[in-house]
Design a protein with these regions (language model features):
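Membrane-lumen/periplasm interface segments of multi-pass, membrane-embedded glycan/lipid transferases
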Residues: 359-446, 554
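Transmembrane-helix signature of polytopic, membrane-embedded enzymes
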Residues: 13-17, 71, 223-226, 245-265
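Perimembrane helix-loop-helix junctions
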Residues: 290-299, 321-352
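Transmembrane helical bundles and short interhelical boundary loops of multi-pass, membrane-embedded
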Residues: 23-50, 353-354, 361-372, 518-557
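Transmembrane-helix motifs of polytopic, lipid-linked glycan transferases
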Residues: 60, 230-254
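Short acidic/glycine- and proline-prone juxtamembrane loop motifs at membrane-interface regions
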Residues: 273-280
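Membrane-interface alpha helices of multi-pass inner-membrane proteins
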Residues: 269-271, 300-316, 320-327, 350
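Interfacial juxtamembrane loops and adjacent helix segments
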Residues: 113-229
């Protein structure tokens, strides 16, 4: 008769878990050593002990969360921060989109410079860091050509796009991100002096403050440019975690959907970077969480308005759409001081005020910059593109639809990391399945008999998501895409994370009416965090693997 694990003493169960983790670590290391030829680069003992120790630490972290974190929001916040730490270190320096510019601006702010001076340069340590880790590292190290296969003697075309690790010749050394670390760490013994690095074309301050605090603390502790990068990432992650924790605490419905999006590898990849998307995404998730509250008091309205104003500092104009959801709260549900139109007007006025103030500040305190060319060159012209769109609406719709189709509607690119140059197929394939699982668990039987949120809230949020997605595409088409081009330049999956979250409640309602899941709300919430945390850990491991372990592209010259 089989032994039921639940009937075993807790100490025995955890002891078995420790043994299983160690065994899995050994098997995992063996897979890396065999499939990626890791024995030629690293000692087998180091790999085996490292993999086993990592899984034991993850198991210990899981035990601590289960034992000490009380409540759904607390458990979710701790998991978000711990999983985010893995992404902060698995992701190599400056490999988040635009992180090189974000690093330079954050570094300047951390040294007390709140203006923008193109003649101001950075320490040599920073210049060495940017030299060793160029943005879009995989693209920067991509090669293509025709070589001869030594086994068959036939000519064979090669293209290393999408591979961070390359091996030139069957017995050649594997080249990859580790070489960049070695290059940077050896800068003290190099004779050459790096080219000076000046301030970037980036004129924001407030969105970079969390990262600047982290950099300042790292500098106080004696760290150099690389340590400042990780310090900034960690404090940025802390800001993302706090916003997510507040969102989970305020959400009254569909909390599995929120936890799943927050723990999605793409969310953690951005949250644990120097990008202002860390706080931007956190504010999006917070505003959507507040829409699940049945009644709004003054505090709820104030938090929503503050988040709405902040997102307009980071991404102006398009984010004015987030003023409108205030009207999704019915009059009978509104208990804040002041009427809804006044709050909406205040949010709109505040958002416009900070937008104009940010633009003025970025111009008034800008020094020694030459004429800033449009991104994309002279072929990009917003006025001409807008006129082209108005003259050719059907062609524009075709361009938008074609862009979505070419990019798997961006829901199939949840595993596209780096500067869109490092695809991880497993995460691309499973990302939509995780969102579907979140919708299924969010469709669980509700505790209360009344059906809430109402169709007005759920449908309104879904409509907002679609309008926001169309607006994001239109903005990129008008401001970043050459006039008349048949596809949109610059769109990325991270822009649509808040869209998927806004659509998940509507999908959950549909699933609840069709398949009627028997799982209760309590069980759904108990299951979602461990499942998504494990998925996030696996995503961080895959990110590390693709940059440092394999696959390795063998180039035959």
């Amino acid at each position: 008769m089989p032994i039921k694990l639940q009937k075993l003493p807790a100490a025995v169960r955890w002891g078995l878990a420790v043994l299983c983790a160690a065994a899995c670590g050994v098997l995992w290391a063996y897979y890396w050593r065999v499939f990626f030829g890791l024995d030629n680069r690293v000692s087998p003992l180091v790999v085996t002990l490292g993999c086993a120790a990592f899984l034991e630490v993850c198991l210990l972290a899981g035990y601590c969360v289960r034992r000490f974190a009380k409540g759904f929001a607390a458990k979710g916040a701790v998991c978000i921060f711990l999983c985010g730490l893995l992404f902060a270190f698995a992701n190599p320096p400056l490999q988040t989109p635009d992180e090189a510019d974000h690093y330079l601006r954050t570094y300047a702010i951390s040294t007390g410079h709140f203006d923008f001076d193109a003649s101001r340069t950075y320490p040599d340590d920073v210049a060495y860091l940017l030299e060793a880790f160029p943005g879009a590292w995989v693209n920067a190290h991509t090669s293509a050509g025709v070589g001869t296969d030594p086994d068959t003697g036939a000519e064979k075309a090669y293209n290393t796009a999408g591979y961070a690790l390359k091996q030139y010749g069957k017995d050649g050394a594997v080249q990859g991100m580790a070489d960049s670390f070695a290059l940077y760490l050896a800068h003290d013994v190099r004779d050459s002096v790096p080219d000076p690095v000046s301030e970037p074309v980036s004129f924001l301050v407030i969105p970079f403050l969390p990262g600047a605090v982290g950099m300042a603390l790292a500098r106080l502790l004696g760290f150099g440019a690389l340590g400042c990068l990780y310090g900034g990432r960690i404090v940025n992650l802390l800001a993302y975690t706090l916003l997510c924790a507040l969102a989970l605490a305020k959400a009254e419905r569909y909390r599995p959907a929120f936890a799943a999006i927050m723990l999605l590898p793409m969310s953690l990849f951005m949250g644990a970077s120097l990008s202002y998307d860390a706080t931007l995404l956190g504010c999006y998730y917070l505003m959507l969480a507040l829409l699940t509250r049945k009644e709004w008091n003054t505090q709820t309205a104030g938090i929503y308005t503050a988040a709405c104003i902040f997102v307009n500092i980071a991404k102006p104009y398009l984010n004015l759409l987030w003023v409108l959801p205030i009207f999704l709260v019915a009059k009978r549900e509104w208990h804040a001081k002041g009427r809804r139109p006044l709050w909406a007007l205040g949010g709109f006025g505040g958002a416009m005020a900070v937008t104009l103030l940010t633009e003025w500040y970025g111009t008034a305190f800008r020094y020694n910059y030459p004429i800033i060319e449009r991104q994309g060159g002279s072929t990009v012209n917003g006025g001409e593109q807008l006129a082209f769109v108005l003259r050719n609406p059907l062609r524009t719709i075709a361009a938008f639809w074609g862009t979505l189709g070419e990019n798997d509607f961006f829901i199939g690119q949840l595993g596209l990391f780096g500067w869109k140059d490092l695809p991880i197929s497993f995460l691309n394939l499973t990302g939509p399945l995780v969102l579907l699982l979140a919708a299924l668990l969010a469709a669980a039987q509700q505790k209360r008999a009344d059906a809430f949120p109402t169709r007005r809230r759920v449908g309104g949020a879904a409509l907002l998501a679609l309008v926001y997605a169309a607006g994001a595409m239109a903005a990129m088409y008008i401001t970043y895409t050459p006039v008349g081009m048949v596809r949109i330049v610059g769109l990325q999956a991270r822009y649509f994370l808040c869209v998927w979250l806004a659509l998940l409640p509507a999908l959950a309602v549909l699933l609840r009416k069709t398949i009627r899941p028997a799982i209760t709300e309590e069980k759904a919430e108990a299951a979602i965090i461990p499942l998504c945390a494990c998925y996030a850990v696996f995503g961080a491991v895959l990110l590390f693997q693709h940059y440092f372990v394999g696959p390795v592209y063998v180039v035959y010259a």
